[in-house]
Swiss-Prot record:
Pfam families: TetR_C_6, TetR_N. Repressor involved in the biosynthesis of the osmoprotectant glycine betaine. It represses transcription of the choline transporter BetT and the genes of BetAB involved in the synthesis of glycine betaine. Keywords: DNA-binding, Repressor, Transcription, Transcription regulation. Residues 31-50 bind DNA. GO terms for molecular function: DNA-binding transcription factor activity; transcription cis-regulatory region binding. It comes from the Bacteria. The lineage of its organism: Bacteria, Pseudomonadati, Pseudomonadota, Gammaproteobacteria, Vibrionales. It comes from Vibrio vulnificus (strain YJ016). InterPro entries: BetI_C, DNA-bd_HTH_TetR-type_CS, Homeodomain-like_sf, HTH-type_TetR-like_transc_reg, HTH_TetR, Tet_transcr_reg_TetR-rel_C_sf, Tscrpt_rep_BetI. This is HTH-type transcriptional regulator BetI. The keyword Transport does not apply.
C-alpha cells in the first residue's frame, strides 16, 4: 500500500510504467530499476512509497481491479434494473472489452494470478475480485432462477470468464469478446432451459 503523501500524479505514472515493463520483459525481469526508468523517476521513490517491487505490483493490481469495478458499475448503471440478460452481458463486457483486454493489462493479470498463489496480500485481492464478480452475477441470476440455481450458474459463468480470458491471453490474437459472449450466453440459455424444466 503506498504511503500517505505520495503525489497523486506519480501513482498513475508508476502503475502504468509497471504494466508497460511487465508487458515488455515479464514480471521476473521487471526490476525496480527498469520500472523507475520507464516512469522517469528514481528507484528511491518506488522503494520509499511502495517498499519495493512487491508493493508496487500490489498497488498496480489494486488499480486494475478498481478500473474493472468502475467499468462494471458504470455499464450496469446505464441499464434498466429489470434487463437481467443485458446486465449479465455488461458484466462480461467489463471483463473482456477495453482496458482489461490491453496487452499490458493482460500480462499483469497473468503475473498477478501466478503470484497470488503464494502471497497472502495478492491472494486477498484475488478473493475480493472473485466475490465481486459472483455478487454481480448472482444479483442478476436470482431474478431468473432460484437462489441455489443462481449460485451454481454464477460459478459456471465465472469459470467460463476465467477460462476464456486465460485462453485469449495466451493466444497471439488476444481475447475475442464476441466469441466469449456467444459461448457464455449459450451456456446461460442452456442452464435457464434446464432449470425451467425442474
Amino acid at each position: 500500500m503506498p504511503k500517505v503523501g505520495m503525489p497523486k500524479i506519480r501513482r498513475p505514472q508508476l502503475v502504468s510504467a509497471t504494466m508497460t515493463v511487465i508487458d515488455r520483459v515479464g514480471l521476473h525481469g521487471a526490476s525496480v530499476s527498469l520500472i523507475s526508468q520507464e516512469a522517469g523517476v528514481s528507484s528511491g521513490i518506488i522503494n520509499h512509497y511502495f517498499g519495493g517491487k512487491h508493493g508496487l505490483l500490489e498497488e498496480t493490481m489494486r488499480d486494475i481491479l478498481r478500473q474493472l469495478s468502475c467499468d462494471a458499475t458504470k455499464r450496469l448503471n446505464s441499464l434498466p434494473k429489470q434487463a437481467h440478460m443485458q446486465r449479465i452481458n455488461a458484466i462480461l463486457d467489463a471483463n473482456f472489452v477495453g482496458f482489461q483486454s490491453e496487452s499490458k493489462v493482460i500480462k499483469t493479470w497473468l503475473a498477478f494470478w501466478s503470484y497470488s498463489m503464494h502471497d497472502e496480500a495478492l491472494k486477498r485481492l484475488q478473493r475480493v475480485n472473485e466475490k465481486r464478480l459472483l455478487s454481480h452475477l448472482k444479483r442478476e441470476l436470482k431474478a431468473l432462477m432460484s437462489k441455489e440455481q443462481a449460485d451454481i450458474v454464477a460459478q459456471g459463468i465465472a469459470a467460463l470468464i476465467d477460462g476464456i480470458w486465460l485462453r485469449g491471453a495466451l493466444n497471439p490474437e488476444g481475447i475475442n469478446a464476441n466469441k466469449a459472449r456467444i459461448i457464455i450466453n449459450d451456456y446461460l440459455e442452456k442452464q435457464l432451459t434446464f432449470y425451467s424444466q425442474q
